[in-house]
Amino acid sequence: MSPPKNLKKFERPEVTPRRNISLLSNRLADAGGWRIREDVLERDYCLAWFLAALSQSDLKPILGFKGGAALKRCYFGDDRFSEDLDFTLLEAIPMEEILRWLHAVYREVLDSSGITVAFDREDRHKHVNSYTFYLRYTGPLPTGSDAKVDITVREQVVFPLAERPILRGYDEFVDVPENRLIQVYSLEEIAAEKTIALFDRARNEPRDLYDL
């Protein structure tokens, strides 16, 4: 039996050209005198797509987006580049369940952008109060890379979470949707966490001061 004539075959979009990443790197260098590496810009682009897909998944109501990446992606959209994504678990769910639900997120990213994202490995260090693992992604550049995801299991959130759109960040990321909402920590909550982190000698992250 042949398919209906008006049924269109699904065509997966191609990944945004590497040229777009190169043009963005050149534009930022011309504007500020500092060239951002293409692999850093690619990570920013791929993580934007991951968050956009996450916002449409069953994980949206149980994860609170936080940290420096949340400041950039949901509040300011500036040139603050993160190597990881931080969340807080809002419901008691085992890591295995989260990893299973993430398969739908990977599929959405691939079908909508052509970017390949997949679970890579758990963090080699033991974490008492967090699920920490790495994602492997392949985007516009020929070689893939990874990004760290840290999900705090138990944390007292003082201020109400906000539901905010995921910012595209740059005009060159034209295919990243901007009308998708995600649960994110309030500015007050993020500022409080960053202030506490400044006094944590074991942490030693200069970005905490920059974010404030």
Feature map (PLM): residue ranges:
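Catalytic cores of NTP-dependent nucleotidyl/adenyl transfer enzymes across multiple folds
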Residues: S2, N26-W34, D44, A48-A52, ...
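Helical scaffold of the NTase/Pol beta-like nucleotidyltransferase catalytic core
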Residues: S2-G64
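N-terminal, well-ordered alpha-helical segments
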Residues: Y45-A52, P61, A69, E83, ...
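Active-site nucleotide-donor binding segment shared across nucleotidyl transfer reactions
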Residues: S55-L85, E91
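Short, conserved acidic/polar surface loops in the N-terminal third of protein domains
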Residues: C74-D78, I98-W101, S145-A147, L161-E163
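Metal-dependent nucleotidyltransferase catalytic core
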Residues: L89-H125
